[in-house]
């Protein structure tokens, strides 16, 4: 990203470009320089504002180098978190690794969730209402064998009507997976 309009670029932008180049960054968008400049200016303003507060607290007429150092140090301490020392991390890792892992109940392989919770299971249902027959159903041999000879014909008709009405009241639910389309 070098070359075009190099003489029109402000000094701060040239410094940012040289910093990027020294870090090994050769290809970047022009907006990157503007974003770094904005971050840089904002950081400097915050540090100088804090230095001015420290200077006023010390009843000094001007900001001096010690105020700026104190402001930078307070920014570093409170803005950027320092990782714990390596020894502390090793000690924490050793104490954590002493606890054995729980034994696996499942067999070998990857345990899968129940089928109803997977994306491969059918997630739809079709409701197929059963058509009610308006005419009297024909009696079959099975129906004749099941009838009690002691019942009157009227009681038999009521019993048949009740048995034929039950399946029509409950809809039948059907679910099936979609098959792949032939290519």
Curated annotation (Swiss-Prot):
Domain spans labelled Histone-fold: 10-77
GO CC annotations, alphabetized: nucleus
GO terms of biological process kind: DNA-templated transcription initiation
Primary residence: nucleus
Pfam families (alphabetical): TFIID-31kDa (PF02291)
Subunit: Component of the TFIID complex. TFIID is composed of TATA binding protein (TBP) and a number of TBP-associated factors (TAFs) whose MWs range from 14-217 kDa. Interacts with TAF4B, TAF5, TAF6B and TAF10.
Protein name: Transcription initiation factor TFIID subunit 9
Gene name per UniProt: TAF9
